[in-house]
Amino acid sequence: MSALRLRNANTPAPELDELSDQTPSESRVLKRQMSMSQRAMSNTLTSAANLSNLLPTGTLLAFQLLTPVFTSNGVCDHATRFLTAVLLFLLAASCFVSSFTDSVKADDGTIYFGFVTFKGMWVVDYPDPSGLGLPDLAKYRMRFVDWIHATLSVLVFGAVALRDKYITDCFYPSPEAETKHVLDIVPVGVGVMCSLLFMVFPARRHGIGYLVTGSVDRR
């Protein structure tokens, strides 16, 4: 009986020693993985913040204010899901249209906004219909790069929307593992590609909702 007690007492000891030997290495691996995940998440949030700078400020502000209201803080039914889809469509259309707007400085230093056309620029709020006091508006005509910027703006908005918790909870309340994986990867991939394309095709217009610098006459 005493031999059995000694055997039972001595048997778990090597296992505890092995666990004590393995635990530090495993904990280091886990800590390393956690740190890598935290860095990846930080880079993702940073890229998302940089992506938001490529969108019109008014559209982005409307998205941030209206999304919690339309989605009921992420808890959607059929009606709120439909209304949220309509909201996203309108905001994406706003990003698209804003890419075809620009600003011009008159002789008196006042900045006016307008829409670019194939022939030039249509200034909306300029008091003189003849355009006296404005630079040559034909230089502001629509170009092919404007269509690229408009498409990229819509893609960037989609990437930002898919990274929003209210949107994902509304349209994907209980996503499967593959769906969740796609929702984590696709916005980041689209954001990186759009950022690279914006570097290749830089935006030179200062349209409605975008930052206007001191030198508007840049052409």
Curated annotation (Swiss-Prot):
Q: Per the record's keyword annotation, is Transport included, yes or no?
A: no
Task: Look up the domain of life of the source.
Answer: Eukaryota
* One Gene Ontology cellular component annotation held by this UniProt entry: endoplasmic reticulum membrane
What InterPro entries does the database record attribute to this sequence?
DMP
What keywords are annotated for this sequence in UniProt? Endoplasmic reticulum, Membrane, Transmembrane, Transmembrane helix
Q: Which family does it belong to?
A: Belongs to the plant DMP1 protein family.
Describe the function of this protein: Involved in membrane remodeling.
Can you say what this protein is called?
Answer: Protein DMP5
Q: Which organism is it from?
A: Arabidopsis thaliana (Mouse-ear cress)
| Recorded name of the encoding gene | DMP5
